[in-house]
Amino acid sequence: MVGSTKIKVLNRDNGSVVYNIPEMNGLRRTFQAGEIKTVTFEELEKLSYIPGGMTLLRDCLVILDNKEAISELLGHVEPEYSYTRNDIINLMKNGSLEEFLDCLDFAPEGVTDLIKTLSVQLPLNDVAKREAIYQKLGFNVDNAIRIQKEAAEPVQEHAQPERRVQKT
């Protein structure tokens, strides 16, 4: 693949992704959560060589609509690699339990992190899928939802106790 080929890249992570590539005149790239940017194949290739770069490419960033670039940079990837936020929401709401279990087993870490976040935000109503998340990822969706609700409740100030018996 030619280094100047333009490739769309999505940050599927919940937070920002930032990387520096010294070989490209100190290029610093920042992706906000859910942001799509167009970068060159050369940039992604150089990113893969720096420490932590492959982890960013596999878990946080998604190469969109370019199977050749995915193949050259990452080799074989599971179908779950290309799941976007909307794909995950659809799987959680409408997918079968077997599809969901496959996703938990084979998806990159960025997808499983997004599943944890979305299971609380949506919230995930399927008890079997909640149990699967707990078994596969060790994340208790029920407790996370309970804690989130407790944190959202206003803090009640305790009133000063009043004497029941008045001595004069």
Language model: regions and residue ranges:
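Compact, well-ordered interaction domains used in eukaryotic information-processing assemblies
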Residues: 1-79
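Charge/polar-rich, low-complexity and marginally structured segments
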Residues: 81-168
